[in-house]
Design a protein with these regions (language model features):
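C-terminal helical subdomain
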Residues: 77-81, 85, 97-144
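Residue(s) in the substrate-gating loop at a strand-loop-helix junction
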Residues: 37
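Substrate-binding pocket helix/loop in short-chain dehydrogenase/reductase
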Residues: 1-3
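Active-site loop immediately N-terminal to the catalytic Tyr-X3-Lys motif
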Residues: 44-48
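Alpha-helical segment proximal to the catalytic Tyr-Lys
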Residues: 22, 66-69
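A short helix-coil junction within the Rossmann-fold of NAD(P)-dependent oxidoreductases
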Residues: 19-28
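Active-site helix of classical SDR
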Residues: 17, 53
Length: 150
């Protein structure tokens, strides 16, 4: 559903930031992590709205970084490739077989992998920021090329 995708990926990000950013500004520090996707810069067939929503996350992250920099607030965008989530089931309208085929022959990333990357970025020294990080399974070269093992 297009509206749900835009509401979650774009509006949700903006609404949450609208609540937390003033608190961070008042504290003079903070770190915002936005979850994008390689789909935000590498479009795929039948993914126009999802790719557009993740491109919005990319643009919003860049703008936020500029807007909040002078307040001591860091903004990092995490852009994963293939992550095994319920998204594939939703993408294929509940067709579990089609969703499972997305990950066939590949060891995809997990939510824990993404969390580990965020934890690593968060512990970096105060003078360092990771503006964006692209994470992919070692079998994925880009959005459209995945080496599948038989």
């Amino acid at each position: 559903d297009w509206d749900a995708m835009i509401d979650t990926n774009v509006k949700g990000l903006l609404y949450v930031t609208r609540v937390i950013a003033p608190k961070m500004v008042a504290a003079g520090r903070g770190h915002i992590f936005n979850i994008g996707s390689i789909a935000g810069t590498e479009a795929y067939e039948n993914g126009a709205v999802y790719c557009a929503s993740k491109h919005a996350v990319h643009a919003i992250s860049q703008s936020m970084r500029a807007d909040l920099l002078s307040y001591g607030i860091k903004v990092s965008e995490v852009r994963p490739g293939m992550v095994e989530t319920e998204f594939s089931v939703v993408r294929f309208h509940g067709d579990r077989t089609a969703a499972d085929n997305v990950y066939r022959g590949v060891e995809p990333l997990t939510g824990d992998d993404i969390a580990e990357a965020i934890a690593w970025i968060a512990q970096l020294p105060a003078h360092m920021n990771v503006n964006e990080i692209v994470l992919m399974p070692s079998q994925q070269a880009c959005q459209y090329y995945v080496h599948r093992k038989s």
